[in-house]
A protein has these predicted regions:
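A short, mixed-charge helix-start or loop-turn motif at secondary-structure junctions
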Residues: 6-14, 93-97, 137-141
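Short, contiguous alpha-helical
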Residues: 4-5, 41-87, 115, 127-165
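Extreme N-terminal tail/first-helix region
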Residues: 1-26
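A generic "alpha-helical surface" signal
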Residues: 15, 19-22, 52-56, 101, ...
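N-terminal first-folded block
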Residues: 27, 35-39
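Acidic/histidine-rich alpha-helical segments that form the ligand environment
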Residues: 20-25, 31, 88-127
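Hydrophobic residues in alpha-helical segments
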Residues: 32-35, 72-73, 118
């Protein structure tokens, strides 16, 4: 999964994004296969998150970006409040209290929904934008989907390295 996706919105790049978004849940499941509950909840290194905490972090980040995508598709240039995925959103939702299997199932369901929405978009809809509080630039649906992919690729690569898979 050592891939990078251009910031240029093209049909090819959209296809790559959809492909990676489809593969990520499978990768997470494969990486967790055979790990005990203890292994899933212990830090992956000194000062590091556990696999469960990492998955929680991915869910929090995806939730914020997906919400931005959905708003951009529903409202013309919506304004999106700025709050941190982990420190604010995570503190409210407390996904960190769930078991890994529940988190992974939740991640898979969220991903199915996101993929259904994105796969039905016309290319022009990928250009719809949202503006986040405190930022001058507008971010497109493409940009936010790319953000999810790039963030998840980094974490998958890190997990593969730390788990030796």
């Amino acid at each position: 999964m050592n891939q990078k996706i251009s910031t240029d919105q093209t049909s090819e790049n959209i296809s790559k994004i959809l492909e990676i978004l489809t593969e990520t849940p499978k990768k997470l499941e494969a990486l967790s296969k055979g790990l005990t509950k203890e292994q899933l909840t212990q830090p992956l290194g000194t000062g590091e998150r556990s696999f469960t905490e990492d998955l929680t972090h991915l869910i929090n980040g995806e939730a914020r970006s997906s919400e931005m995508i959905y708003q951009a598709l529903l409202v013309k240039e919506p304004f999106f409040s700025d709050f941190h995925p982990d420190r604010d959103w995570g503190k409210l939702t407390r996904f960190d209290l769930l078991d890994f299997s529940d988190l992974l199932n939740y991640f898979k369901i969220r991903r199915k929904v996101l993929l259904k929405v994105l796969s039905e978009l016309k290319e022009v809809e990928w250009s719809r934008t949202v503006r986040e509080e405190g930022k001058k630039r507008k971010e497109s649906v493409y940009w936010r989907a790319r953000t999810i992919v790039m963030h998840e690729l980094d974490h998958i690569q890190d997990l593969e390295k730390k788990l030796g898979k």
